[in-house]
């Protein structure tokens, strides 16, 4: 059972998307702790500096320095972060991107802009998982 509030990290270079997800999580999963990162390059160093791993990472695929695919690959190869759930986020609806993300270990895939209904369903499932863990 989750004894503290969920920790969600949003890795996206688009501040509008960061804001959308931050607001959605705060409305749907209160209380929640949000951490915003602007690029995949920042993720592993930020994880190394915390003792409280996130319960979920929302990861954009299209970022300027280190894209989401490479970030996800690094994450899945770096203990103890291999098992942190990751939902990838992209403007691309290409099946190849979804398949590649799944092969690299993504737990879910959202196309931008995600509908609020889809966010409700996804976040509701995550809250149930958090409450059971």
Segments (PLM) and residue ranges:
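C-terminal output helix
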Residues: 114-125
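Conserved acidic segment of CheY-like receiver
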Residues: 5-25, 57
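His-Asp phosphorelay/catalytic-motif detector in bacterial-type signaling
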Residues: 5, 52-56, 80-85
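Receiver (REC) domain active-site loop signature in two-component systems and cognate sites
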Residues: 63
């Amino acid at each position: 059972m989750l004894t503290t509030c969920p920790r969600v990290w949003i890795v996206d270079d688009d501040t509008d998307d960061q804001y959308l997800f931050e607001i959605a999580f705060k409305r749907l999963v209160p209380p929640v702790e949000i951490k915003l990162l602007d690029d995949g390059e920042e993720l592993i160093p930020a994880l190394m500096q915390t003792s409280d791993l996130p319960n979920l990472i929302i990861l954009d695929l299209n970022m300027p320095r280190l894209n989401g695919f490479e970030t996800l690959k690094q994450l899945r190869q770096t203990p103890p972060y291999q098992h942190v759930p990751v939902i990838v986020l992209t403007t691309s609806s290409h099946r190849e991107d979804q398949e590649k993300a799944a092969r690299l270990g993504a737990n879910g895939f959202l196309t931008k802009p995600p509908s609020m209904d889809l966010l409700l369903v996804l976040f509701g499932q995550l809250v149930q998982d958090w409450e059971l863990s």
